[in-house]
Amino acid sequence: MKLVDRFRGAATGTSRRLMVGAVGAALLSGLVGFVGGSATASAFSRPGLPVEYLQVPSVAMGRNIKVQFQSGGANSPALYLLDGMRAQDDFSGWDINTPAFEWYYQSGISVAMPVGGQSSFYSDWYNPACGKAGCTTYKWETFLTSELPQYLSANKGVKPTGSGVVGLSMAGSSALILAAYHPDQFVYSGSLSALLDPSQGIGPSLIGLAMGDAGGYKASDMWGPKDDPAWARNDPMLQVGKLVANNTRIWVYCGNGKPSDLGGDNLPAKFLEGFVRTSNMKFQAAYNAAGGHNAVWNFDDNGTHSWEYWGAQLNAMRPDLQHTLGATPNTGDTQGA
């Protein structure tokens, strides 16, 4: 029996607590290295690309939010790229670890990478987000669905509706939830290697452990105790009907924990990907049972919890995004070349 399979069975009492601790240790060690690592200069976008560093005012969060931005042209649709559990405050993990701006240059899609949001699940928290660095306000859903699209529309000529949102790991479930509740804004949602049933089973306990390690945050400050309605409200498995009713175009990816020549050949990355895969398969079944018919499912026979695979998926989905968002490539623009 595979290691990950041993943790998926039912457990109660002492065995359940031991299971949470064991899985939590693996999750934490995986998150430390693979959901937002250290920035290296060579990983950033090449010089010459028209990447801007915006300071977007947020009344909801009481501060300016840094957003890395690349225009897709006048009246272009937007792609919001959301970071992982260990999102940094200086640059987006998407820019640190992938050439995302390069891939989407002249695609006709404006790319927005909000910076920050460690352990936030890009949600509106009940309470202040208090961690090792102090307390701040997390109202990310309000920012992403109201303040940021209004700013980009007014200042950068970006369409406020008909956008796409893609997230990895922590933010994969966030991307689906944002699309479920804001269908006019997000007609496309991509989830990469996410836990898609966070409110169920040991999910709240594991999320609490991970958030505590990634910044010292408390899950109860985010969504309250595990039986609070906010947990169900932010659970893609329980909100799959909304995605089907909205006819949202979704792209769901998860590997199986086996590395390929892309990399990620280490125990934490392998374990974590294998662990979340089951929830992705269940989500597919729930989507199909609800009558969904507008999805791409990539459950590869390889892939670990690491940026190499998430980047490959983002690059692969570009034509699908362009088609769904109605983007017009601007290959005649030589800016940034």
Swiss-Prot record:
It holds the Pfam family Esterase. Keywords: Acyltransferase, Cell wall, Cytoplasm, Disulfide bond, Secreted, Signal, Transferase. One of its GO terms (molecular function) is diacylglycerol O-acyltransferase activity. The active site is at S169 (nucleophile), E273, H305. Disulfide bonds join C130-C135. GO terms for cellular component: cytoplasm; extracellular region. Its main location: secreted. The keyword Phosphoprotein does not apply. It catalyses: an acyl-CoA + a 1,2-diacyl-sn-glycerol = a triacyl-sn-glycerol + CoA; 2 alpha,alpha'-trehalose 6-mycolate = alpha,alpha'-trehalose 6,6'-bismycolate + alpha,alpha-trehalose. SUPFAM superfamilies: alpha/beta-Hydrolases. InterPro entries: AB_hydrolase_fold, Esterase-like, Mycobacterial_A85_antigen, TAT_signal. Residues 1-42 form the signal peptide. Its EC number is 2.3.1.122, 2.3.1.20. It is found in: Secreted, Cell wall; Cytoplasm. Substrate binds at M85, R86, S169, D197, F275, V276, R277, T278, K282, H305, S306, W307. Residues 101-111 are annotated as: Fibronectin-binding. The keyword Secreted applies. PANTHER family: DIACYLGLYCEROL ACYLTRANSFERASE_MYCOLYLTRANSFERASE AG85A, ENTEROCHELIN ESTERASE-RELATED. Homodimer. Belongs to the mycobacterial A85 antigen family. The antigen 85 proteins (FbpA, FbpB, FbpC) are responsible for the high affinity of mycobacteria for fibronectin, a large adhesive glycoprotein, which facilitates the attachment of M.tuberculosis to murine alveolar macrophages (AMs). They also help to maintain the integrity of the cell wall by catalyzing the transfer of mycolic acids to cell wall arabinogalactan, and through the synthesis of alpha,alpha-trehalose dimycolate (TDM, cord factor). This is Diacylglycerol acyltransferase/mycolyltransferase Ag85A. It comes from Mycobacterium ulcerans. The gene is fbpA.
